[in-house]
UniProtKB/Swiss-Prot annotation:
Residues 1-22 form a transit peptide. Signal peptide: none annotated. Its cofactor is Mg(2+); Mn(2+). The gene is Acsm5. It comes from Mus musculus. Its EC number is 6.2.1.2. The lineage of its organism: Eukaryota, Metazoa, Chordata, Craniata, Vertebrata. This is Acyl-coenzyme A synthetase ACSM5, mitochondrial. The modification N6-succinyllysine is found at residues 96, 302. The modification N6-acetyllysine is found at residues 96, 151, 302, 335. It is found in: Mitochondrion matrix.
Length: 578
């Protein structure tokens, strides 16, 4: 079912890419039919289509619109590495290359619809190609960050029963170390210009593959992606999204919160392993915008600012941690000729950061809030009035409320749980379930609502004000870190008798991991500073390095309940002065 082409191909899009549109407003482009479809679904006037595939029903349609002159000539994808190398694809070229990639997945890899492929790559063009190839073949992609250790990879490959993994040279040794323990793993695909024993070289196969491929017919409810999200009481859980929850669900955020059009060039600095990368892919391409990517082997403020000056980027999205770094620079030295819209999310934004950014650039920071389980739940859209410190208003089609512990809706001004109404009608832009964890899926629902686990209050004007989390998950620089994962890593060191991990305030990262440790008797007399460094390095080798405790305190005993459960909340409140 092609959602856009009908009725649009005969309309001419007058706007074209040339100079940046800063002081003038172009004529509004014709609204793509997918937007009308989304609005009809959200209003209950039209059901979610039985069949939907983002690659076929969206990307291939934009390719046709390019051919008929109904889209500006800016690329669909633009990648740079900071050393002079650039990759640009139109939607037509993206279609050609992704069909070749689809043939690689179906051919040599032998993958079929419903099979799962783990995708762990840095910011390389191959990540976007393989993501689209997964959609074309019905293969379910499982993105992961490049900092995963062998232990992390083993757990994810086993839990997801992944049949294939795609990664780069840097992570291949870790995969080799655990692949024998992953019985479902059949093929290992290497994105590299060199070969490695036991691996299939993706780039070699891509060059030789046929550009002809028939996209599989997928149902709207078929799985498109699985994300592992950190929890507080055990191993990361699997969040499953469908073709329609992402493929149709991000039309709204793309047009409203991100304010993207066919003429925009959108840069989100996120890592490919985080859900924000998928948000960008679906939001930008559903609206015909260009996705800009900088390889960013090392993320630093000057690289970001210089890139904004050098390239015609119109829309920028960074986590608050990065904006905290950017405002420490003298922003008056940088001239952003094309930048018109700035977005942030993933953690609370300090009002002073927003004020500093606006005072030096003239641009607002538009905060948004969502989860791995959802799309954008609420946000400050481009033309809305911003209340500094607020996450903005509910994003359609969500009915967002503040509820008490029994699921009763609270009046404005009352603190409670952020909740999304899922009954009598579950929003189509919502995760399917926590895979293989029906208990967790059931526990996330209360009455008519899905409970986010975050607390806030809503004011009389419908703006939401974030207060904190119900759970113990640590949100450091937008990296969600489960305390159990860090505590388990610490427990593998002989110096640690027991530990409790909580968040601790940090002026740059918002919050960081702090470990309270009770030492084994044999280590009680060791030098605290040296032991701290040793434990930090130990955690980095056992789990993803971003999880290591930046702060360590050695104490004689941990606070516990009468039943022996560690009271992380008491330690956390102590850190935050509550």
């Amino acid at each position: 079912m092609r959602l856009w082409l009908r009725g649009l191909a005969c309309q001419a899009l007058r706007s074209s890419w040339g100079v940046c549109r800063i002081h003038t407003q172009p004529p509004p482009p014709p609204i793509p039919e997918v937007v009308a479809t989304w609005e009809a679904i959200s209003l209950g006037r039209q059901p979610v289509p039985e069949y939907f595939n983002f690659a076929h029903d969206v990307l291939d349609v934009w390719s046709q619109l390019e051919k008929t002159g109904h889209r500006p000539p800016n690329p669909a994808f633009w990648w740079v590495n900071g050393s002079g190398t650039e990759v640009k694809w139109t939607f037509e070229e993206l279609g050609k290359q992704s069909r070749k990639a689809a043939n690689v997945l179906e051919g040599v890899c032998g993958l079929q619809p419903g099979d799962r492929m783990m995708l762990v790559l840095p910011r390389l063009p191959d990540w976007w190609l393989i993501s689209v190839a997964c959609m074309r073949t019905g293969v379910v992609m499982i993105p992961g960050v490049s900092q995963l250790t062998a232990k992390d990879l083993k757990y994810r490959l086993q839990a997801a029963r992944a049949k294939s993994i795609v990664t780069s040279d840097a992570l291949a040794p870790q995969v080799d170390a655990i692949s024998a323990d992953c019985p479902s793993l059949q093929t290992k695909l290497l994105v590299s210009d060199t070969s490695r024993p036991g691996w299939i070289n993706f780039r070699e196969l891509l060059r030789a593959a046929s550009p002809e491929h028939n996209c599989v017919r997928t149902r709207s409810g078929d799985s498109v992606a699985i994300y592992f999200t950190s929890g507080t009481t055990g191993a990361p859980k699997m969040v499953e999204h469908s073709q329609s929850s992402y493929g149709l669900g991000f039309v709204a955020s793309g047009r409203r919160w991100m304010a993207l059009t066919e003429s925009d060039i959108f840069w989100n600095t996120t890592d490919t392993g985080w859900v924000k990368a998928a948000w960008t892919l679906f939001s930008a391409w559903s609206n015909g915008a260009c996705i800009f990517v900088h390889e960013l082997p090392r993320v630093d403020a000057k690289t970001i600012l210089n890139t904004l000056c050098r390239f015609p980027i119109t829309t920028l999205c960074c986590v608050p941690t990065l904006f905290r770094l950017l405002v420490q620079e003298d922003l008056t030295r940088y001239k952003f000729q094309c930048l018109r819209h700035c977005l942030t999310g993933g953690e609370a934004l300090n009002p002073d950061v927003r004020d500093k950014w606006k005072s030096q650039t003239g641009l607002e920071l538009h905060e948004g809030y969502g989860q791995s389980e959802t799309v954008v739940i609420c946000g400050n859209s481009r033309n809305s009035t911003i209340k500094s410190g607020s996450m903005g208003k509910a994003s359609p089609p969500y009915d967002v409320q503040i509820v008490d512990e029994e699921g009763n809706v609270l009046p404005p001004g009352k603190e409670g749980n952020i909740a999304v109404r899922i009954k009598p009608t579950r929003p189509f832009c919502f995760f399917n379930c926590y895979l293989d964890n029906p208990e967790k899926t059931a526990a996330s629902e209360q009455g008519d609502f899905y409970i986010t686990g975050d607390r806030a209050h809503m004011d009389e004007d419908g703006y939401f004000w974030f207060l904190g989390r119900n759970d113990d998950v640590i949100n450091s620089s937008s990296y969600r870190i489960g305390p159990v994962e860090v505590e388990s890593a610490l427990a593998e060191h002989p110096a640690v008798l027991e530990s409790a991990v909580v968040s601790s305030p940090d002026p740059i990262r918002g919050e960081v991991v702090k470990a309270f440790i009770v030492l084994s008797p044999a280590y009680a007399s060791h030098d605290p500073e040296a032991l701290t460094r040793e434990l930090q390095e130990h955690v980095k080798t056992v789990t993803a390095p971003y999880k290591y405790p930046r702060k360590v305190a050695f104490i004689s005993e941990l606070p516990k309940t009468v039943s022996g459960k560690i009271l992380r909340s008491k330690l956390r409140n102590q850190e935050w002065g509550r």
